[in-house]
């Protein structure tokens, strides 16, 4: 988790189900005026989003930011590519880790911190179906144990 995280606007719960998150980092987002207004109104969808490193820059793709209702001519295309702001060393590290290793960059959540839109970006490795079933099984077992412990403690 990012330190001092502000108001969470959107989360990508599907990413934690489909991927094993290895590392996370906070990135700034380059947005236009109407886009930041839509983000503050929580009109953003991270479900199919991904990021990739191209020419020393990190770009966010397939993230839908709904057009601002009162934006008229200033509205941008809802699923356009958006640049992410990171330090050069972070970008080089991400490029190294994603190149040919089966790792990908997945947006985990968007939040407002000190007036700026921030994105929690996860370095992730895809899960197989049997891994997903295993994690669901483990979660249900933990839930059952907690339920039994609660019943024992209430007696």
Curated annotation (Swiss-Prot):
Cellular location(s): Cytoplasm
Biological process terms in GO annotation: trans-translation
SUPFAM superfamilies documented for this protein: Small protein B (SmpB) (SSF74982)
Alphabetical keyword list: Cytoplasm, RNA-binding
Keyword Cytoplasm: yes
GO MF terms held by the record: RNA binding
GO CC term (a single one): cytosol
Family annotation (Pfam families): SmpB
InterPro entries registered for this protein in UniProt: SmpB, SsrA-bd_prot, SsrA-bd_prot_CS
PANTHER family according to UniProt: SSRA-BINDING PROTEIN, TMRNA-BINDING COMPONENT OF TRANS-TRANSLATION TAGGING COMPLEX
Function text: Required for rescue of stalled ribosomes mediated by trans-translation. Binds to transfer-messenger RNA (tmRNA), required for stable association of tmRNA with ribosomes. tmRNA and SmpB together mimic tRNA shape, replacing the anticodon stem-loop with SmpB. tmRNA is encoded by the ssrA gene; the 2 termini fold to resemble tRNA(Ala) and it encodes a 'tag peptide', a short internal open reading frame. During trans-translation Ala-aminoacylated tmRNA acts like a tRNA, entering the A-site of stalled ribosomes, displacing the stalled mRNA.
Family statement: Belongs to the SmpB family.
Protein name stated in the entry: SsrA-binding protein
């Amino acid at each position: 988790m990012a330190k001092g995280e502000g108001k969470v606007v959107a989360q990508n719960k599907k990413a934690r189900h489909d991927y094993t998150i290895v590392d996370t980092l906070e990135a700034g987002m380059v947005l236009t005026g109407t886009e930041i207004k839509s983000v503050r109104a929580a009109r953003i969808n991270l479900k199919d989003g991904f990021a990739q490193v191209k020419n020393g820059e990190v770009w966010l793709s397939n993230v839908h930011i709904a057009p601002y209702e009162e934006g008229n001519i200033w509205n941008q295309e809802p699923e356009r590519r958006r640049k992410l702001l990171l330090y050069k060393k972070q970008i080089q590290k991400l490029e190294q880790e994603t190149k040919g290793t089966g790792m990908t960059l997945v947006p985990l959540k968007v939040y407002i911190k000190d007036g700026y839109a921030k994105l929690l970006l996860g370095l992730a490795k895809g899960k197989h179906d049997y891994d997903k079933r295993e994690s669901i099984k483990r979660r249900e077992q933990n839930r059952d144990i907690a339920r039994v412990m609660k019943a024992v403690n209430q007696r």
